[in-house]
């Protein structure tokens, strides 16, 4: 199974570099994969040395230049833990020649890590993925197969129009049994989009008047409800710090002050940790 995936992956790399492989090329790739396995060849450049010149030359870009170390390692050092995060914005901005091989590899690692344990796959800023043809098709596939691996798919986007305008909107709508809507004062202006997501005008009004960063509107097969996490000022000082400027400030404080960054960050918010000792946040 791994060899079949590797064969398809190499075929994709060649296609991205304007080499249309025929049966002879694929047979050669498969033979060389077997030979590389038998001889414990792990690096891409060593594997390429086994190939015919036209195949080897097409793959040169993946072992040279500033990105040449991405695929040409002696061993795979990517370790997945019970909580793994990948920053996709930079990868998706690299262009298909680089982004696609990386995505295919990450997809493979994620899927192999799903062995039936309860899992949650979160796609934050999903508009980036919905706008990418390969990622979009992978999302379509995940909707249908991840549940068999006991994995739930969670997609988040700041703009619901990106989801509605996606070519896989029918799949997104039919396969997401639970939807959580953030407060949106402009909801009335795009009521038609909300109605495409199954909401009525009363529900749109609730979203338009909900309190930002405090209330959320949930719809599911079991019913609908406006709810709040009831976070106090201490919890909000951290849970509400999600914008890039705040995250960067926190990282700078941690780098400069170590564990003391917590107190300094709270002071910038007019709060003191001592005031909350022994109390709920």
Predicted regions and their residues:
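P-loop NTPase motor domains
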Residues: 1-151, 155, 164-167, 203, ...
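C-terminal regions of RecA-like/P-loop NTPase motor modules
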Residues: 160-281
């Amino acid at each position: 199974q791994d060899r079949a995936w590797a064969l398809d992956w190499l075929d994709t790399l060649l296609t991205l570099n304007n080499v249309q492989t025929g049966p002879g090329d694929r047979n050669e790739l498969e033979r060389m994969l077997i030979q590389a396995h038998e001889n414990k060849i792990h690096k891409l450049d060593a594997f390429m040395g086994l190939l015919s010149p036209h195949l080897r030359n097409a793959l040169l870009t993946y072992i040279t230049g500033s990105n040449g170390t991405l695929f040409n390692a002696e061993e795979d050092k990517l370790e997945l833990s019970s909580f793994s995060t990948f920053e996709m914005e930079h990868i998706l901005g690299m262009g298909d020649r680089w982004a696609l091989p990386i995505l295919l590899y990450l997809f493979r690692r994620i899927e192999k890590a799903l062995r039936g344990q309860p899992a949650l796959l979160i796609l934050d800023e999903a508009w980036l993925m919905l706008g990418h043809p390969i990622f979009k098709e992978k999302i379509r596939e995940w909707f249908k197969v991840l549940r068999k691996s006991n994995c739930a798919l969670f997609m988040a986007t700041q703009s619901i129009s990106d989801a509605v305008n996606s070519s896989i909107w029918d799949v997104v709508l039919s396969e997401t049994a639970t939807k959580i809507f953030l407060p949106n004062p402009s909801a009335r202006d795009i009521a038609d989009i909300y109605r495409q997501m199954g909401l009525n005008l009363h529900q749109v009004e609730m979203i338009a008047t909900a309190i930002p960063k405090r209330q959320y509107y949930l719809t599911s097969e079991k019913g609908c409800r406006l709810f709040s996490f009831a976070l106090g000022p201490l919890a909000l000082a951290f849970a509400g710090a999600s914008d890039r400027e705040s995250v960067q400030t926190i990282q700078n404080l941690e780098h400069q002050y170590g564990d003391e960054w917590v107190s300094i960050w709270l002071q910038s918010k007019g709060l003191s940790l001592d005031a909350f000792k022994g109390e709920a946040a």
